[in-house]
Amino acid sequence: VRTPFCKAGTTFKGFSAQKLGSLVIRELLDRSSIDGDLVDEVVLGCVANPVEAANVSRVAALMAGLPENTRAYTVSRNCASGFESVTSAYEKIMTGFDDVVIAGGTESMTNIPLIFNEHMTTLFSKLMKSQTAFQKMKTVLSFRPHYLKPIVGVVCGLSDPVCGLNM
């Protein structure tokens, strides 16, 4: 079971990675007639884990109605994330550690955040540390418009930090 591919910012723009993952998990369980209580673990790959769901697999599993005692973890290996989750599940089943594992991937490229640059985060930090009205005013007045230029999370996350190539 999978969701269809679509361009970022279009059909699924209102769906978070955890929501997309939970929909697929729920549909898989419904189609297969597997009781959720039998699922030992959920392993999902996700390139850009949402900040509000750091372990997106766990959140998706719970949103899909799996019991709280179901183990879940997220794999983050850029383009290999989903494949790694499947091979990890396979290994656990083959070694007898688990009997039923749900594995796959989830992603919402639309919802990868824009990030404040170093100038802006430094300004926020100084503002939080300012104790007097004068210190706060001095910090605010040091603001420059270029501080608002964001770092595009999806571009940053999909570029190799060593060689700069797009992954």
PLM regions with names:
Residues 7-36, 53-54, 61-167:
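Acyl-thioester C-C bond-transforming condensing/cleaving domain
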Residues 46-52:
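Glycine-rich phosphate-binding loops at beta-strand->alpha-helix junctions
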Residues 38-45:
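Short glycine-rich phosphate-binding loop at a beta-alpha junction
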Residues 1-4:
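Short polar catalytic/cofactor-binding loops
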